UniProtKB/Swiss-Prot annotation:
Residues 16-94 form the GIY-YIG domain. It holds the Pfam family UvrC_RNaseH_dom. Its main location: cytoplasm. It comes from Vibrio vulnificus (strain YJ016). This is UvrABC system protein C. InterPro entries: GIY-YIG_endonuc, GIY-YIG_endonuc_sf, GIY-YIG_UvrC_Cho, Hlx-hairpin-Hlx_DNA-bd_motif, RuvA_2-like, UVR_dom, UVR_dom_sf, UvrABC_protein_C.
Amino acid sequence: MTQIFDSVSFLKTVTHQPGVYRMYNAEAVVIYVGKAKDLKKRLSSYFRKKVDSEKTKALVSNIAKIDVTVTHTETEALILEHNYIKQYLPKYNVLLRDDKSYPYIFLSAHRHPRVSLHRGAKKRKGEYFGPYPDSGAVRETLHLIQKIFPVRQCEDTVYANRTRPCLMYQIGRCAGPCVSSVISDVDYAELVGYLRLFLQGKDNQVLELLVQKMEIASQQLKFEDAAKFRDQIQAIRRVQEQQYVSEDSQEDMDVLGFAQENGIACIHILMIRQGKVLGSRSHFPKIPQNTNAQEVFDSFLTQYYLSHNEARTIPSRIILNQELAADVEAIQLALSDVAGRKVQFHTSPSGSRGRYLKLSNTNALTAMTTKINHKMTINQRFKALRDVLAMDSIARMECFDISHTMGESTIASCVVFNSEGPVKQEYRRYNITGITGGDDYAAMGQALERRYAKQLDVEKIPDVIFIDGGKGQLNRAHEIIAQYWGDWPKRPVMIGIAKGVTRKPGLETLITVDGDEFHLPSDDPALHLIQHIRDESHNHAIAGHRAKRGKTRKTSALEGIEGVGPKRRQALLKYTGGLQELKRASVEEIAKVPGISHSLAEIIYQALKQ
């Protein structure tokens, strides 16, 4: 630090009101954001002569400036603190590494409603059920729904262009509303009504209705219908046995388990909606050294619930451990304010709630132990690689790969690893253009130029660069990167990874820029790390290539037609249900598409027939 922060003069200007403070270092970077009920009292605590916390000592030694924002209430301060943490990602704050939105089950407002997975903003007309902990839980529920309530799950464009029921109808997974002779609107609406009640958690109401239906069908000697209702009843009861917490509880709850050890904290959330367990998820926030459990937990609570602040995602009850409830009153008030209803925290649960809290704590401990073991494995692999490459330290590695099919839709990928493993938010794909199809050297050169030609922050310069390829690829990569590393404070080690003759894992040949080749034993931890980063790069490239190839093949036939831009292409595909259906359409059918004249329809028809 170039100067010592004058805390005495600063504290004279601070008020006793609630608010938020931002601490900056000498480079004017925000290093900590905090909130307080009494700003003067809280900020004074940092500058006492005797401070026990090592984290606080380290923080104070780096302070060059403090900004203060006064708020009307502590709740306002809490929300503002959360927004600042999201904006600045300060070094000394606990950071929740979770930018994923939670998935829902969506029931559309269509004449014949469709049920599907939904993630993101709720813009479409219809009903949303959830949230679910992950897409796997949603797909499992949708699979179950298909068996009990065969409401359609096909896209509207597919539905609109059916002339006879699809395979899903044949195997009993769809009622077939696309064909009017299969099921009436009234019967389909009744089926959707059962599904709606089921997703709302009103299983017993559905059971009562189905039992009545079964008895009526039996009395009328419609035994096939009665058997169908019986199967639905049995399936719902099996689901109830698997999911219900208690028969008398129909409330929404989150049960939060907690574990912390060796600089790693885990919060395990068990999600219960309408009395049913939807699933669970473990979270591992990024925590500064010497951060106590209370601060970790409070920071997590705020960031987790305010990041997903739609009213439906905040349950009416949150169950947590007694020893972590010291300072949650302000958080409870803030969540109630955001949700628009009272949110209650329970710290001494009994009965089924107590059992689920114990289970959640056990899951948190198990997940944390697994994480620690994984970290130890990664550390061992990094140490082995340092020994193999004779390097003092490896903080960052990058790996490049190229993917294409016979030169079509070429994509390059770059993946990043640090000492904790993959850094997926820094993965990148490069759309390769302007080269001869199949020229991997040119593709690699273009990707590396786009990656390294721009100015890099020091911490973004890799210690090791892996190239998935042989000597030619590595030499080309070295030529490109050598143009840019003149101003770098360090020069990365470059290694080529050539597959063995049989392309079998464990037989890879490693190549240096000097042309030396070497192999590692198949059980060597260093080789396992190299295989890991190579496979990540390979999979990332293939995923991008397949997506690009699929998009190209779907639209390329229309892209060359004069007068057909993106909007008309979209209208054509949406109206007809896809490219193959469009190719089979007549001129008159194409002319029915909104925005397509008869003369343009003839041009499109002739172009697609070539």
